[in-house]
Amino acid sequence: MIAVIFEAIPVPEQKNRYFELAGQLKSELMRIEGFISVERFQSITTEGKILSLSWWETEEAVKNWKKHFMHIEAQVEGQQTIFSHYRIRIANTLKDYSFNKEDNFNV
């Protein structure tokens, strides 16, 4: 399993545009074979910083998303107008385990 960690600081007046684009891309993202899930978070220690954590079955699936035309268009817009900074890390999962005290509790 592959994790893609996207940390970004949007220009304050463009933050909503990032979330709008992410919402528009979600249906395309879900069509990529090997995509598992995505969640977005906001930092409590760095003002304005957001994190997108996506999970993928294979590195090939990540590559297919990277070259998807709508994603490329969104990247260009992000670089030109939305983000003042971003960083992407792609990592293999070394271990994956959890504890469930209740059926609806996941770690």
Question: Can you say where each PLM-predicted feature lies in the sequence?
Answer:
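Short S/T/G/P-rich N-terminal loop/turn motif that feeds into the first structured element of a domain
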Residues: M1-I50, E57-K67, F83-V107
